[in-house]
Amino acid sequence: MSPGGAGCSAGLLLTVGWLLLAGLQSTCGINVTAVQDPSLVSEGENEGEEEAENDSEVENEPQAEAEQDVSNKTVVKEVEFGMCTVTCGVGIREVLLTNGCPGGESKCIVRVEECRGPVDCGWGKPISENLESVRLSCVHTSPVNRFKYVWRLLRPNQQAVILANDSAILEVQRETHPMAFQCETLDNNEIVATVKFTVYTTAELQMKRSSRPDTDAVLVFVLTIGVIICIFVIFVLIFIIVNWATVKDFWASKASTTEIQSELSSMKYKDSTSLDQSPTEIPGHEDDALSEWNE
């Protein structure tokens, strides 16, 4: 082989070696990247999850703060209960908010709720009556059909009779003798109110109506006299307060006049006593003069 051919073959081998080495490096690089890709992906996913969690935590923090603020506001709010509309049985009352009202108001109504008092309401009055019939009403609130009603006819020394009427209103015709009725208001089979009524006869009702005007006239007369006396006393007090200086001078002059009269009466009394004593003293002096003359 010639030296030129040997040099060419050596250069060719060197070139092929470099190409093989470059191919191996590229292959290793591809494998390395192929091996590292899953880890990188997993790391990227983990980082994404961490970022999502951080974002969710950042978003949840304002929500938690808002919930805390709401809870604090609910704690600050104060509730006050109004008076019940009834003194017995079942009624309604207002629930008032005394703090945190809209518009800066001192109190505002939140809701209306049911309230209850003592069960026994005693004796009630009819809602309407005439010479022939009477209408009686049970204790209830709206809606009326929420409760159950039991009407009883009360009899002395006997068991009460349960009537067929189960409504809140009972209309009764007057009889020749007075009658007594009782209504029981039930809520979930629990008695929440009872009230009794007396239904008088026609003659008794007429007698009550005839005697009522006399009583009313006496009551009106007494009230009128009382009002007049109160007005007179008020005017006298106002006059004394307005003219206090004049009133004070008047009482002072009256007091001085009384003192002068008392002094004059005391002086007259002294003069009268001195006059009464002088005749008794004169005979004593005469006796002394006679005794001296005799000596």
Curated annotation (Swiss-Prot):
Modified residues (Phosphotyrosine): Y269
Signal peptide (from-to): 1-29
Glycosylation sites noted in the Swiss-Prot or TrEMBL record: N72
Subcellular location(s) per record: Cytoplasmic vesicle, Secretory vesicle, Acrosome inner membrane
Ranges facing Extracellular side: 30-220
Protein name: Sperm acrosome membrane-associated protein 1
Main location class: membrane
PANTHER family documented for this protein: SPERM ACROSOME MEMBRANE-ASSOCIATED PROTEIN 1
GO annotation terms (biological process): acrosome assembly
Segments of skewed composition (Acidic residues): 44-68
Source organism (scientific name): Sus scrofa (Pig)
Tissue: Detected in spermatozoa (at protein level).
